[in-house]
Regions:
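N-terminal phosphate/diphosphate-binding loop that engages ATP/GTP or pyrophosphate donors
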Residues: 49-111
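Conserved catalytic-core segment of NTP-binding enzymes
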Residues: 134-145, 150-234, 243
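Flexible beta-alpha connector loops of hexameric P-loop NTPases
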Residues: 113-123, 179-180
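Conserved beta-strand scaffold positions in the cores of enzyme catalytic domains, especially
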Residues: 28, 59, 106-108, 231-234
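Short, glycine/acidic-enriched loop or turn micro-motifs at the edges of active sites
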Residues: 64-66, 113, 152, 212
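Residue-level signature of catalytic and energy-coupling elements of molecular machines
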Residues: 35, 109, 128, 149, ...
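C-terminal lobe/tail of nucleotide-utilizing enzymes
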Residues: 1-23, 193-292
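Extreme N-terminal, non-catalytic leader segments
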Residues: 1-37, 41-58, 93-94
Length: 292
């Protein structure tokens, strides 16, 4: 990639300190993707699949809607970190105010966001993660796995915050074969590639969340080829998952022995395995049919 000058945005973004390193082995990864693609459902089911294996899992929602952990709390709202920061300084917050336990003991955190039309959601995510750092959340809670669920329609400084080294070192993009989902996935991958070159993160692969559109697998495989990555798991479209969502729970909780629960367990294993490998940095291949 050609040498570029640092933009005002990047200068602002990189002035934040790196999070303190955890004193125990820990796997951190983030799920990105177009809004409505199923990131939060996927993240919650992966979290519960890993928790059912005896792992301590922390799920951090980085979406202004603050609904990333909803399926692990049966729809019960959780106080967001940003709402707490409106009342006092980050140094005055208690960790137990920011971190709550959900189904299976999953540690749930919601960054939150500003009121619609006021403030910057990306900056809110930065503030929330800095508040967790101030309370040394990783070393106190000692999670084995940390999952960031991040809105990926716009990869600005705040929404890119989890990509930074010390937060999420492995990025997985949830996509379907729909054109807008593929377009968003391609843009996210380019952003990840930029950070990879600086040593911040790497693309672990694509998660195909099927919508049963024509040539779906073929289109996503073509995208994976363009990005020099792979599909780590395919999730078939399932009424079982939709029914669980309507009930406000994960399919891992509603039907733990069902076929979709088994598929999420396979996905959880595949993601952890991918985190242990070192794939090439994502980049655009010559002759790609996708517009980045």
């Amino acid at each position: 990639m050609a040498q570029t000058t640092t933009t005002a945005f990047e200068a602002t973004f990189f002035e934040f300190d790196q999070p303190a390193a955890a004193n125990h082995p820990m796997t951190c990864f983030a799920l990105y993707g177009k809004g409505g693609i199923g990131k939060s459902t996927t993240a919650a089911n992966i979290a519960l699949a890993l928790a059912s294996q005896g792992k301590t899992v922390m799920l951090i929602g980085c979406d202004p809607k603050a609904d990333s952990t909803a399926l692990l709390r049966r729809g019960k709202p959780v106080e967001t970190v940003l709402s707490l920061l409106r009342t006092r300084h980050k140094s005055q917050l208690r960790l137990e105010e920011m971190v709550t336990r959900g189904t299976g003991g999953v540690l749930c955190v919601e960054a939150g966001g500003p009121k619609p039309g006021v403030g910057c959601a990306g900056r809110g995510i930065i503030a929330a993660l800095e508040a967790l750092k101030a309370q040394d959340a990783f070393n106190v809670c000692k999670p084995d796995v940390v999952i960031f669920d991040v809105l990926g329609d716009v990869v600005c400084g705040g929404f890119a915050m989890p990509i930074r080294d010390g937060w999420a070192k492995n990025i997985f993009i949830v996509t379907s074969g729909e054109n807008m989902a593929i377009h968003a996935a391609a843009n996210i991958a380019v952003a990840v590639g930029t950070f990879s070159e600086r040593g911040y993160a790497r693309l672990g692969g694509l998660i195909l969340n099927c919508r049963d559109v024509p040539r779906e697998r073929e289109k996503v495989e073509e995208l994976a080829g363009d990005l020099h990555t792979r599909i780590v798991c395919e999730l078939p479209r399932s009424e079982e998952v939709q029914h669980a969502d309507e009930q406000g729970v994960t399919v891992m909780e509603m039907a733990p022995e069902g076929p979709m629960a088994q598929r999420y367990r396979e996905l959880a294993r595949a993601v952890l395995a991918a985190c242990e490998t070192t794939p090439a940095a994502p980049k655009r291949a010559g002759g790609s049919s996708f517009t980045f």
